[in-house]
Amino acid sequence: GYRKVEWAEDHDLFLRMMRAGMRIGKVEKTVLSWRDSPGRLTRTHPAYAEEQVWRMKAHHLSLESRVSARGVAICGAGPIGKRLARMLKQEGVQVRGFFEVNPRRVGEKIGGVPVAGQGEFGKRWRNAVLLSAVGVEGGRERVRELAGAEGYTEGVDFWCCC
């Protein structure tokens, strides 16, 4: 059931259910008519703020055995990737590196973690779990393509985080 957490309790429940092996699906017929309003909790309560959503993602990722054992490599060294890396480190996850397409970022270190170029994708940090943190339009699909071509399996050793 629900528990007291700093983030959205319903999302937390769904993530715990999925980790426990439960499946979530869509019911084909309408069972509830939903009214949305500007005063809705998901738009006004601090537990639903973007920062808390990322904390929840980092927390639940840190509980994945592959993530805790192998660490992660993050696709995207922009604001989203940096935020995710910082929060994962706070959860005790080893961030092994970033992959980035911007040539100005390649070779830098972010929080002591190296940034590699696209040419090293699938070779460097290959044992780490791959996380996509690319927020630009089409970014998720592009990383998903590259990950699949390199033998990553989504939901096993690769996740899209945004």
Question: Where do the protein language model's features map onto the residues?
Answer:
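Hydrophobic residues within well-ordered alpha-helices
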Residues: 17-18
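Rossmann-like AdoMet/SAM-dependent catalytic core
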Residues: 56-66, 81, 87, 140-144
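Glycine-rich adenosine-cofactor-binding loop
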Residues: 69-89
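Short internal beta-strands
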Residues: 96-102
